Design a protein with these regions (language model features):
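Nucleotide/phosphate-binding catalytic cleft detector across ATP-hydrolyzing
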Residues: 1-192
Length: 192
């Protein structure tokens, strides 16, 4: 899976959606699918995908490395920094991950650090303003999904994971760090 956070056709910006006639003016609707291998998402003004990997970085790693356009860095409330997406995927080794790692592929991976970071990064990417829209002053609504076999049993878990008060920073490519602070309740999250 490749990270899509840029488009050569739109002056180096991520793909933008010019118009969505079905949207409500008082809501910012986010579609977010956190799969076993990648995160796919869209909002009223953008779409994106990135590999579902997160790797904690040593304290000095960010200052030493020159960022690539596809780099995604996540910083939590405690100042811990994680590489996300392609950057994290490239850092994996045979010793640190396997194709049966329960934090990536387990049946109940919703509470794993990787899942939570991937969800936060996906939400942040969907909350970015551009020429075609802004979430400012709007209720954030998240539509996510589960495999049909898990829908009845797991919908409450995924809602529980998404329902939170968020406060974190995100750095995409060569951009500056950007702070995100917002809250979602279970009433803001829909599962299909």
């Amino acid at each position: 899976t490749r990270t899509i956070i840029q488009s050569q056709t739109l002056n180096g910006q991520r793909p933008a959606i010019r118009q969505n006639p079905s949207r409500r003016q008082d809501q910012w609707v986010i579609g977010l699918d956190i799969g076993y291998s990648s995160v796919k998402g869209m909002s009223q003004n953008t779409l994106f995908t990135f590999p579902k990997f997160a790797k904690k970085l040593p304290k000095n790693a960010v200052a030493l490395a020159k960022p690539l356009d596809t780099d995604i860095l996540y910083r939590d409330e405690n100042g811990e920094i994680y590489a996300v997406g392609e950057k994290a995927e490239k850092m994996l080794s045979i010793e640190t991950a396997s194709d049966n790692d329960p934090t990536l592929f387990g049946r109940n991976h919703y509470y794993s650090e990787t899942f939570k970071i991937a969800a936060r990064v996906g939400l942040a990417m969907a909350l970015q303003s551009n020429t075609y829209g802004s979430p400012e002053g709007k209720r954030i609504v998240v539509q996510t999904g589960l495999p049909s076999a898990y829908m009845l049993d797991d919908a409450r878990y995924i809602k529980e994971v998404f329902a939170d008060h968020y406060s974190f920073d995100l750095k995409m490519g060569r951009e500056d760090w950007r702070h995100y602070e917002f809250a979602l309740t279970e009433n803001d999250i829909f599962v299909m």
